[in-house]
Amino acid sequence: MIVLRKTLAVLAAVFLALAAAGVGAQAPGLPQLNRDYVRLDPPRPVASGDRIEVIEFFYYGCPVCYELEPTLARWLFNGPASVTLRRVPALATDNWDNFAKLFYTLEATGHLARLHWPVYDNFHFDGIKLNEEAVMVNWVSHNGVDKEKFISAYHSPEIQAKLAAARDMTRNYEIKGVPSIVIDGKFVTSARMAGGTRELMQLVDRLVELARKERAK
């Protein structure tokens, strides 16, 4: 059974914190290169057309990624306009493979939107070892996923290809830690650089605007 008892409390706390933070807040200055973000040189290609591409590199086992997720979900729900979000499981080490395979298998079987947050919550809050394949398979089968279809997809060449692509992207985008966010193939920032998860999404908004201005030149 999915344990979601913390979800509403987490989201409510995030919304209240964001609302409180907005009272009396001063307009932030321009993002500072090499302090708030780094610039990829050359810029990496994007496939988002007229939209600004935002890529989140994450790891389900990362507590800061877990903390970020409700804020990121709220940011995605509210805008900004003309932005597309892409999630990529970072693969800095082979120990992260199982969680990346879980992400891509849930995506391939059509259950990612429903189970993305519960993976985080059940792992971090409930201590369910979802990075272990046997535990993972039992968990998904108890949460409405066909067990045999999941296992077949999990071990398929298609998922292995996605892992290889994610590993290449982690290296190509010079990802040093998670969560990291890449804006329009040009700017890379992180919760560490921003000073926190709430500050990270505020910084992303500013970098999206910077990317939009650079596109207009």
Sequence positions of predicted segments:
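Extracytoplasmic thiol/disulfide redox context detector
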Residues: 2-94, 209-217
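Solvent-exposed loop/turn segments at secondary-structure junctions
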Residues: 60-64, 91-95, 121-126, 156-159, ...
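Short, flexible segments with low predicted structural confidence
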Residues: 34, 44, 77, 112, ...
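Conserved strand-to-helix beginnings and helix N-cap segments that scaffold or border functional pockets
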Residues: 66-69, 96-100, 194-197
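Structural microenvironment flanking redox-active thiols in thiol-disulfide oxidoreductases
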Residues: 78-141
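C-terminal cap of thioredoxin/glutaredoxin-like
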Residues: 142-217
